[in-house]
Regions:
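Conserved coupling/interface region of RecA-like P-loop/ASCE motor cores
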Residues: 60, 280-349
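Proline-centered turn/helix-capping motifs that create local helix->coil transitions or kinks
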Residues: 173-181, 269-270, 326-339
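P-loop NTPase Walker
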Residues: 1-107, 237, 320-323
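Alpha-helical scaffold elements adjacent to nucleotide-binding pockets in ATP/GTP-utilizing enzyme cores
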Residues: 37, 65-73, 93-100, 118, ...
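Conserved helicase NTPase motor core
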Residues: 1-29, 54, 86, 115-119, ...
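ATP-hydrolysis module of ASCE/P-loop NTPase motor domains
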Residues: 103-201, 305-311, 332
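A short helix-to-beta-strand connector/capping loop
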Residues: 78-85, 301-304, 348-352
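Short helix/loop segment immediately N-terminal to the Walker
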Residues: 137-150, 231, 235-242, 332-347
Length: 352
């Protein structure tokens, strides 16, 4: 079925160069619009040999959807699919960068990446071992109102330790904090921080397990890719030439490290489109990801702000309710709870 852009989608598709930030509501057709834009840039931009339009998204399912749709639009223009563009997840992109020059990240050529199942088992072993050797210490974390539930909490103690440690390790890696650095910071702090010490003990055991296997985990890929890009300017210049256009999906869930990687790849003169919905950020509660990176990008000098406000996914009543909830957060009597950020109102649309 031919793609007929809505007026707001057409505004996005007018992009030719520079930087653009797009706030897109659910059901606004952002994937289709971004896919069409990628194909349009492949067909109409003056790409040289070895250059590609890079589409970056968050998860594998979205990457597959983008690859299919961009391929369809490219074929409609009489071009061969899979030429002139690349679709990657952020972690897939980081893996490409590290695999190409592992020495820059301090790795050997044959390094392994543990999948989520293996890293989950490694973390569980480290956390459960710590919990067994600190079997009664959970009571130190209970307030008086929870003492009656101490027995139940004790039964759940190993899993509570594991979940807490997983969050600790995730955030430590996002902030590029190695166990040795954290240990020195804790010593310098002076006061006892039992929860931080627990997380650090398990972090150290987890990292020992990775080193024993000669492996890294998916969380390592982002920081190692950043290390590689910062270590070799010539390598970074080659990648900037390779990807003169970068289109970023789900930008509301970008972390500081992820944004730094893409900023480096874009450089001073590159072309960058970021699309996302700040109201749909799902990773900020348990990672360092934040929709503020997208909001602040849209406010930057020279960035073209655009919206995709037309939703074809929900009935008008549902959209009115969602908009009212957003208005309520803007007017909340507690100033600390007000949503005072860039957000888009959804507009019902029967056009798909």
């Amino acid at each position: 079925m031919p793609f007929t852009p809505r007026p707001k989608q057409a505004e996005v598709l007018n992009f030719r160069a520079g930087r653009m930030g797009v706030v897109a509501v659910p059901g606004s057709g952002k994937t289709r619009t971004l896919s069409y834009l990628a194909a349009q840039l492949v067909a109409e931009s003056d790409l040289q040999d070895g250059q590609e339009v890079l589409v970056v998204t968050l998860v594998n399912a979205a990457a597959g959807n983008f690859a299919r749709q961009v391929g369809e639009f490219v074929k409609e223009r009489g071009l061969l699919p899979n030429i002139g563009y690349r679709v990657r997840t952020l972690h897939g992109l980081a893996n490409d960068i590290v695999r190409e020059r592992p020495a820059l990240a301090g790795l050997g050529d044959g390094f392994n990446i543990l999948d989520e199942r293996d890293t989950g088992e490694l973390l569980q072993d480290a956390a459960y071992s710590w919990a067994r050797t600190h079997a009664g210490s959970y009571q130190d974390y209970l307030g008086e109102e929870h003492l009656d539930n101490a027995r139940v909490i004790g039964q759940e103690w190993p899993d509570l330790v594991k979940d807490t440690a997983a969050n600790f390790i995730r955030q430590a890696k996002d902030f590029q904090l190695e166990p040795d650095t954290l240990r020195e910071l804790l010593k310098a702090y002076g006061d006892s921080l039992p929860l931080a010490e627990m997380g650090l003990d398990i972090y150290e055991a987890y990292e020992r397990g990775l080193r024993y296997r000669g492996a890294v985990d998916f969380q390592d890929l982002i920081r190692l890719a950043l290390r590689a890009l910062e270590a070799d300017r010539d390598y970074l210049n080659r990648l900037q030439y390779r990807w003169p256009f970068i289109l970023e999906d789900e930008a509301q869930d970008s972390s500081q490290l992820q944004e730094r990687i893409i900023r480096l790849l874009v450089g001073e003169d590159g072309n960058w489109v970021r699309v996302g919905d700040p109201n749909q950020a799902i990773y900020e509660t348990f990672t360092t990801a934040s929709p503020d990176f997208l909001r602040n990008f849209i406010k930057e000098r020279g960035v073209k702000p655009r919206e995709l406000p037309n939703s074809g996914r929900s009935a008008p009543g549902i959209i009115r309710l969602a908009n009212r909830l957003i208005e309520w957060t803007l007017e909340h009597p507690n100033p600390d709870l007000r949503l005072t950020r860039i957000c888009a109102r959804a507009v019902p649309s029967t056009v798909r």
